[in-house]
UniProtKB/Swiss-Prot annotation:
Belongs to the universal ribosomal protein uS8 family. This is Small ribosomal subunit protein uS8. GO terms for biological process: translation. SUPFAM superfamilies: Ribosomal protein S8 (SSF56047). InterPro entries: Ribosomal_uS8 (IPR000630), Ribosomal_uS8_CS (IPR047863), Ribosomal_uS8_sf (IPR035987). GO terms for molecular function: rRNA binding; structural constituent of ribosome. Part of the 30S ribosomal subunit. Contacts proteins S5 and S12. GO terms for cellular component: ribonucleoprotein complex; ribosome. It holds the Pfam family Ribosomal_S8. It comes from the Bacteria. Keywords: Ribonucleoprotein, Ribosomal protein, RNA-binding, rRNA-binding. One of the primary rRNA binding proteins, it binds directly to 16S rRNA central domain where it helps coordinate assembly of the platform of the 30S subunit.
Length: 130
C-alpha cells in the first residue's frame, strides 16, 4: 500500500456513504494520531486498537452521525506520497472559513490547524475535514 492515510480516509468516506456505524483499518501510529485529532474535533465518536487473527494491529473506528447524516461531509487528502505539501504556520489555510479542520503533521506531533497556529509551528498538511 502506497498511501496508508489516504486508504484510511477512503475507508471512512465509503463507510459513511453506506451508513455503517463502524469501520476497521490496519493500525499504525500515524493513523492513530490522525484519528486522535478527528475524535478531539468531534468528527468521529472514537476508535479502539485491537489485533486481527494474524496478530496485525487494527483500528476499529466508530463513526458519528447527526440526525441520520454523516458528521464528516468532506474528507480530502492534501499531501500525497507523490506530492508532499508542507506549509509554514502563516500559510496553513483555514478550511471553509474556519468551519472545517486541516490535520497537520508537525515536529510537535499531529494536530489540527488551530493547534498548529497556537503552537506557532508548521508542517505537512495531511488532509482537510469538513
Amino acid at each position: 500500500m502506497n498511501d496508508p492515510i489516504g486508504d484510511m480516509l477512503t475507508r471512512i468516506r465509503n463507510a459513511q456513504l453506506r451508513g455503517k456505524s463502524t469501520v476497521s483499518t490496519p493500525g499504525s501510529k500515524l493513523r492513530a494520531w490522525v484519528l486522535d485529532v478527528l475524535a478531539d474535533e468531534g468528527y468521529i465518536r472514537g476508535y479502539e486498537k485491537s489485533t486481527d487473527v494474524n496478530g496485525h494491529p487494527t483500528l476499529n473506528i466508530e463513526l458519528k452521525y447527526y440526525e441520520g447524516e454523516p458528521v464528516i461531509r468532506e474528507l480530502k487528502r492534501v499531501s500525497k506520497p507523490g506530492r508532499r505539501v508542507y506549509m509554514g504556520v502563516k500559510d496553513i489555510p483555514s478550511v471553509r472559513q474556519g468551519l472545517g479542520v486541516s490535520i497537520v503533521s508537525t515536529p510537535k506531533g499531529v494536530m489540527s490547524d488551530a493547534n498548529a497556529r497556537s503552537n506557532n509551528v508548521g508542517g505537512e498538511v495531511l488532509c482537510t475535514v469538513f
